[in-house]
């Protein structure tokens, strides 16, 4: 199914407000996931409170941003301007999944199930392949590789030209981003919890990787030249400037939207360190108590008897 961007005019303020994109697949997926989360949240709230309302609100914010990234002017102009496409990729890969994970969907779904369903979820989380897929290193590699593969292979042009590739690509971006934040933040139920120090170390390497990709797109050859030339766009920036702006969106704006993630990582690391300190203090107190009970008195045996102690002292 070939995509027809239509006779879009220049990207003005009026176009931002008035332009909407018909993306039935994204609309169906968003409606299905939002309905499922809302249903599970209501069912879980009747028995216990799995998540706070603010956390559920974060999931709703993620859904709204997903709508904006696919059904608003971004969804339309992503087929015409390179930098708008970069903005869409950034939102689907980073921003939308970040808010979705804050809603703790795994916890919400588990709380809505019965005892048998919860056991199945627990067994699934305890499986070996779940620990491998949800490992911080695995999800970080997928997060780092996806933009490189998208922009530096024919995948980018194919996703623009065919909706059979474009629709799964948009969904895949959200899935990869969700797995990344799910494994790194560990705010939801996860197969295994790792030290947040690992995530901070991984973030250093990711910053370098994102920066190099931005430089490659900025200084490298033009991407999808035949596709953009075939649109015959007579307004807006030229192809080189368009791609330069897109590189800035992916690089600079990507670092800006990543600041809340880093702050949450540091907060989680501080929380883990405090919990570890409590455990260590408890172990030290237990060891000290055991030593005091089994310790041999350093004084002579008769010094523990008041009468003998006074007699020997007078003598």
What are these regions (language model features)?
Residues 1-315:
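Alpha-helical membrane segments of multi-pass proteins
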């Amino acid at each position: 199914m070939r995509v027809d961007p239509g006779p879009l005019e220049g990207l003005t303020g009026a176009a931002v407000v008035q332009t909407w994109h018909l993306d039935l697949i994204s609309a169906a997926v968003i409606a299905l996931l939002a309905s499922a989360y809302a249903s599970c949240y209501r069912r879980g709230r009747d028995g216990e409170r799995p998540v706070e309302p603010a956390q559920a609100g974060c999931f709703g914010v993620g859904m709204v941003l997903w709508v904006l990234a696919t059904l608003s002017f971004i969804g339309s102009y992503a087929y015409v301007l390179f930098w708008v496409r970069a903005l869409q990729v950034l939102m689907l890969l980073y921003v939308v999944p970040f808010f979705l994970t804050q809603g703790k969907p795994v916890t919400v779904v588990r709380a809505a199930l019965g005892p048998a369903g919860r056991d199945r979820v627990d067994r699934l989380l305890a499986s070996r392949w779940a620990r491998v897929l949800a490992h911080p290193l695995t999800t970080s590699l997928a997060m780092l590789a996806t933009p490189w593969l998208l922009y530096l292979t024919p995948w980018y042009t194919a996703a623009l030209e065919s909706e059979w590739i474009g629709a799964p690509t948009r969904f895949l971006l959200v899935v990869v981003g969700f797995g990344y934040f799910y494994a790194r933040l560990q705010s939801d139920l996860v197969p295994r919890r790792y030290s947040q120090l690992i995530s901070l170390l991984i973030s250093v390497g990711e910053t370098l990787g994102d920066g190099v990709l931005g430089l490659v797109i900025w200084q490298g050859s033009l991407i999808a030249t035949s596709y953009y030339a075939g649109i015959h766009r007579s307004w807006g920036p030229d192809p080189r400037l368009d791609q330069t702006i897109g590189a800035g969106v992916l690089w600079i704006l990507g670092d800006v939207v990543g600041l809340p993630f880093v702050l949450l990582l540091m907060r989680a690391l501080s929380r883990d360190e405090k919990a570890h300190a409590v455990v260590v203090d408890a172990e030290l107190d237990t060891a000290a108590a055991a030593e005091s009970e089994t310790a041999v008195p350093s004084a002579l045996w008769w010094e523990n008897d008041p009468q003998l102690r006074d007699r020997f002292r007078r003598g």
